[in-house]
Amino acid sequence: MALWGGRFQGETSALFKLFNDSLPVDYRLFEQDVVGSIAWADAIASVGIITATECSDLKKALNELLVEVKGDPAIILASGAEDIHSFVESALIAKVGDLGKKLHTGRSRNDQVATDLKLWCQSEGAALVARLQTLRSELIALAEREFDAVMPGYTHLQRAQPVTFGHWCLAYVEMIERDLSRLTDALKRANTCPLGSGALAGTAYQMDRHALAAALNFASPTLNSLDSVSDRDHVVELCSTASISMIHLSRMAEDLIFFNSGEAGFISLSDEVTSGSSLMPQKKNPDALELIRGKTGRVYGSLVGILTTMKALPLAYNKDMQEDKEGLFDVVDSWAICLDMAALVLSGLVVNRPNALLAAQQGYANATELADYLVSKGMPFREAHHVVGVAVVAAIAKKIPLEGFTLAEFKTFADIIEDDVYPNLTIEACLAKRDVLGGTALTQVKQAISAKKIV
């Protein structure tokens, strides 16, 4: 039976029921709905709506229902209820009779679902924090393992300057830490309890909403009933935080896909996270990484969806908000599996050091070192930049690295070049000179890893 049938004389269209019912989506809020209902039973008992005995009976029945559904989750969808709130109330009435009809006194589905959803976000958010921390740990472990593995760094996907694989890992540690900061910050803002806000104007019963919030482990109650039932900022923020994090996961996936390619060959991926071709026996495809990259667009789509749904809604609750959950649930599911998969990829990754080093030695990645050398001899940097550019063109024509020039050939570009130029052009020198906070020098990478391990 619908929770709102008294006002209506005609039958609901089967098509409308299919269109209107949200149980196929919001069944995931079952546990939160029961927990919220238990707290609400205490709240209405505190203002004399039900007796202590009735409160105890309601809470016992709700806890029994919780156990039953956990044992057989299929009974929710088999019920044909309109939504998760209707399912819980109907199941409760089946257990305790008319007493179950008292539970909704002073409560609306508007503040009920707002509370359920915030409880769900808090629970799932905590799990996502743990996943981000696991990925961070995997990156730090990989950075420590491969801190001195030399590889080319890129700009515009062109070889630019040599870096280490450890330094590359630490770049993504920084991104993951920002994701963690954003997520924990968003969860703090979502840590307020809407229950007691009623449909929009507040409940008519003078209960202690601070106690109600505390019972549900919220930091505090919300302060405006109109905002409480119509606020979905926590949904938007969770989707936004996920989207930004998925940018980072997608970029990492793209880097690793390239590093794993035959053209680069810097890394090898574990068989655990790769698959083959139905036609080409030699293929070992980085499917896990490609799916991370692919799911990023899916997460973005859900963010745009909730932003668009909420953009022009008048206060307070509107049925449009029923569309908040499907996208949110999919975002959280997608983000969670991508975080888990990224961690698994990293745990089995092997760096092919000779290939990565060879690539770093090619492409004139030491050109900046030659320019810096000329500056150390007194040449203005802009002039040095031009001279080295000319030298690179000549080296390309001769098919030699910069260090392949004889001293006499070097002097045709600048008389101030001496024999001491050659030690400055080695990979080791290129790395060692970047001995500044945040740089790729081995000393800096070691210090950065040590600092990250302490946190």
Curated annotation (Swiss-Prot):
Family: Belongs to the lyase 1 family. Argininosuccinate lyase subfamily.
Pfam families: ASL_C2, Lyase_1
EC number: 4.3.2.1
Species for this entry: Shewanella sp. (strain ANA-3)
Protein name as annotated: Argininosuccinate lyase
Catalytic reaction(s) noted: 2-(N(omega)-L-arginino)succinate = fumarate + L-arginine
Encoding gene, per UniProt annotation: argH
Pathway(s) served: Amino-acid biosynthesis; L-arginine biosynthesis; L-arginine from L-ornithine and carbamoyl phosphate: step 3/3
Disulphide linkage map: none
Entry GO CC: cytosol
UniProt-recorded Gene Ontology molecular function terms: argininosuccinate lyase activity
Catalytic EC class: lyase
Cited PANTHER family: ARGININOSUCCINATE LYASE
Lineage, uppermost ranks: Bacteria, Pseudomonadati, Pseudomonadota, Gammaproteobacteria, Alteromonadales
Keywords recorded for this protein, A-Z: Amino-acid biosynthesis, Arginine biosynthesis, Cytoplasm, Lyase
Record flagged with keyword Nucleotidyltransferase: no
Gene Ontology biological process terms in this record: arginine biosynthetic process via ornithine; L-arginine biosynthetic process
Compartments, record wording: Cytoplasm
